[in-house]
């Protein structure tokens, strides 16, 4: 399972992707977070990155680390 924090404008996209099962918990800034079962892979990291910073992986720590490693590799490759 992962916990994702998303900007408010992604609520529709997240409902379309994950259905009505996850409970979206609102944050004070208008964003929301939710837990969802995910098969963590490079494709998952790419999906997160495809939203241009509008999704943050909050937990677990090893998945956050995976995002950092992937984006570091991409940044290095594109210098």
List the predicted regions and their residue ranges.
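Polybasic (Lys/Arg-rich)
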Residues: 1-79
């Amino acid at each position: 399972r992962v916990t994702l924090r998303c900007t408010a404008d992604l609520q529709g996209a997240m409902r379309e992707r994950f259905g009505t099962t996850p409970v979206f918990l609102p944050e004070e800034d208008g964003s929301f977070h939710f837990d969802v079962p995910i098969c963590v892979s490079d494709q998952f990291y790419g999906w997160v990155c495809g939203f241009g910073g509008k999704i943050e992986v909050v937990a677990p720590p090893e998945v956050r680390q995976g995002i950092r490693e992937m984006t570091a590799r991409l940044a290095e490759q594109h210098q």
